[in-house]
Amino acid sequence: MENFKGLQKSLYIWTDSADLDKRVEQLKAATGGDVALENVHRLSFSSYANSSFDLIVIECAQLTDSYVKLLHMLKPSGKLHLVSFIGPAASLLQEIKLSGFINCREDSPDALSAEKPGYETGSSARLSFAKKNANAANVWKISGDDEELIDEEELLDEEDKQKPDPAGLRVCSTTGKRKACKNCSCGLAEELETEKQSQKATENAKSSCGNCYLGDAFRCSTCPYLGMPAFKPGEKVQLADNLLKSDI
């Protein structure tokens, strides 16, 4: 009991009254404080206030559901000491630990000890979270007027805006160029011949008024572009195959 020196108030729970006074005097000498007595069979009827004792000693007793009550009776960091206990030490230590005690250990073959945590049952403590960075809130105050934005129109060149010529899209599967091979069987030779005839017909078409590109509202009745949408001056326009051909 050398570890109990300086404990002011203790509770001794006894079973056998033989030599009881002697054991109480020994406990007083070890602690240097006052010692209260309680019979193990009267413990459930007792009405001790919470945090009343610095030390509780139990001798030759087997408690079942009283360890939680003893935990409330002890002050924070109070000690529990079992002497000449009844039952397996491992089972008792597990039961004491599940009741809320800490540092549960077997001091000797006939003695067990445990402690109450250094805080009162049901108490709360304020958690210390990391402080908010005041500079982080200033990020939202940054003005976006100083940022340079990219003009979308500058991303494209004039060549990128031009539509691809459909005449140059299809190539021969054999030569890899827009030129039919000798024994063309994919239809590219016929397509190139049709484009050639259409180009000749377009070149032969002459505009006497100079308004063909403006649309049908400005075209004459014999205009080869009649029925076609307006186009830009100088833009290549492909005429239908039946234009400039006699209907008879």
Curated annotation (Swiss-Prot):
Binding sites annotated in the UniProt record for [2Fe-2S] cluster: C172, C181, C184, C186
Gene Ontology MF: a single term: metal ion binding
GO terms (BP aspect): iron-sulfur cluster assembly
Annotated stretches, region: Fe-S binding site A: 172-186
Required cofactor names: [2Fe-2S] cluster; [4Fe-4S] cluster
InterPro entries: Anamorsin, Anamorsin_N_metazoan, CIAPIN1, SAM-dependent_MTases_sf
A GO-annotated cellular component: mitochondrial intermembrane space
Gene3D superfamilies assigned to the protein according to its UniProt record, in alphabetical order: Vaccinia Virus protein VP39 (3.40.50.150)
Location(s) in or outside the cell: Cytoplasm; Mitochondrion intermembrane space
Signal peptide: none
Domains as described in the record: The C-terminal domain binds 2 Fe-S clusters but is otherwise mostly in an intrinsically disordered conformation.
Protein name (database record): Anamorsin homolog
Organism: Drosophila sechellia (Fruit fly)
Protein encoded by which gene: CIAPIN1
